[in-house]
Amino acid sequence: MKIIYIGPLLWLLGSGGSAHGARPFVTDDARLTTAGSCQLESWTRLNRASKPSARSEEFWAFPACNPSGNFEVTLGAALGRPLQGPQSKDYVVQAKTLFRTLSPGNWALGLAAGKVFHPEINPGPNQFGNSYFYLPWSYASEDERWVMHVNLGGLRDQASKNNRLTWGSGVEWKINERWLGISELFGDTSGGRYWQIGLRYSIMPDLLQVDSSLGRPFGAAATDLQSLALPYGPARWISFGLRFTPASIF
């Protein structure tokens, strides 16, 4: 069977936030990088499909800056290395703003839109076509021990001229001062549905964090992905990430 090649930015999954959610989320939050500063999120994902020929590795870097206070710009890149076939490089540019900021016992709402650059665009669990947008909504508990996130959006695949609606829902909960847990579901109207759970640990609170996550498709998506040799459509994945979030740069 010929291997269908799909770039790594087209399925995730953190960038969320930014184009993925704050690591290790795929579902984005209605928050921005600290005003007057930048942050860097980088991670490696190991895709472990049931067929060895469909396994792959991904390497990601997503710097984001917020120079004005309510306008965040993200420039991201990913390198995908399948076990068989050529490697892929993908790039994304995204802008994000908030209509309402998050506070304890209250909700926030924003808008994000972006463009993915890759010669072969094919949306997958990362919720990307050539162009995309989404509305991130978040709600924080009074004590901020947990925060809920919901995303609704759409994507336009320029190659197939198809439009798809995308969705995501997740919860982050504060275990203690250094540990944070996450769980989420996300997918699109093509039938793709995925779950992911993860942990984040603060080496230096509010500055340097490491994380890890585990996820896989479920329902029709799980059946479809196990029956095809897709380098970026695995039955399951595990990822390891690093976040650098300084309080001020500019």
List the model feature ranges, each with a label.
Residues G14-G16:
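N-terminal signal peptide c-region/cleavage motif recognized by signal peptidases
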Residues A19-F250:
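Transmembrane beta-barrel domains of Gram-negative outer membranes and organellar outer membranes
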Residues M1-W11:
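Sec-dependent signal peptide recognition
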